[in-house]
Amino acid sequence: MPYRSTEILSPGPADKAPLHRVTLTHDQRHLRRKLLHLENDDVVMLDLKEAVMLADGDLLALEGGGYIEVKAAEEALYEIRPRDRLHLIELAWHLGNRHLAAAIDEGRILIVRDPVIRAMLEGLGATVNEAVEPFHPLRGAYHGTGHHHHGHGHDPHHG
């Protein structure tokens, strides 16, 4: 019989020891209702009221007690290295303008591999290398608002 969870603890408190673990890619961590396969071959039915973006270390609270830990899976990524800080800002702008998920650090940006985007970045002078590691992109400005649309000139006060 599968476990069932209707609640997320984010971030997972250090004093809550998980019973099991589920490892998911970035795309797989965006969910509302799904049967998840745990590392020990058990399953948990996640049944939330609304869609969430799970993060590495979150805990799924199980009905009847106990927790399942969410781990970020290693993914095939591009590691983008800029010439300097100003170049990092420019590259981040181009990625954001294309609505791409990106993990931005002081000296690098990580994105999911896409050869077209790689060519664009290299054309902008970036060094792009393949990497395999967990992907923790920044949450966007519209994260948690319950929708994914945004205004592009729809406000009559902004031309």
From Swiss-Prot:
<comment type="function">
    <text>Involved in urease metallocenter assembly. Binds nickel. Probably functions as a nickel donor during metallocenter assembly.</text>
</comment>
<protein>
    <recommendedName>
        <fullName>Urease accessory protein UreE</fullName>
    </recommendedName>
</protein>
<dbReference type="InterPro" id="IPR012406">
    <property type="entry name" value="UreE"/>
</dbReference>
<dbReference type="GO" id="GO:0005737">
    <property type="term" value="C:cytoplasm"/>
</dbReference>
<dbReference type="Pfam" id="PF05194">
    <property type="entry name" value="UreE_C"/>
</dbReference>
<dbReference type="Pfam" id="PF02814">
    <property type="entry name" value="UreE_N"/>
</dbReference>
<dbReference type="InterPro" id="IPR036118">
    <property type="entry name" value="UreE_N_sf"/>
</dbReference>
<dbReference type="InterPro" id="IPR004029">
    <property type="entry name" value="UreE_N"/>
</dbReference>
<keyword id="KW-0143">Chaperone</keyword>
<feature type="region of interest" description="Disordered">
    <location>
        <begin position="140"/>
        <end position="159"/>
    </location>
</feature>
<dbReference type="GO" id="GO:0016151">
    <property type="term" value="F:nickel cation binding"/>
</dbReference>
<keyword id="KW-0963">Cytoplasm</keyword>
<dbReference type="GO" id="GO:0019627">
    <property type="term" value="P:urea metabolic process"/>
</dbReference>
<dbReference type="InterPro" id="IPR007864">
    <property type="entry name" value="UreE_C_dom"/>
</dbReference>
<dbReference type="GO" id="GO:0006457">
    <property type="term" value="P:protein folding"/>
</dbReference>
<dbReference type="GO" id="GO:0051082">
    <property type="term" value="F:unfolded protein binding"/>
</dbReference>
<dbReference type="GO" id="GO:0065003">
    <property type="term" value="P:protein-containing complex assembly"/>
</dbReference>
<keyword id="KW-0533">Nickel</keyword>
<comment type="similarity">
    <text>Belongs to the UreE family.</text>
</comment>
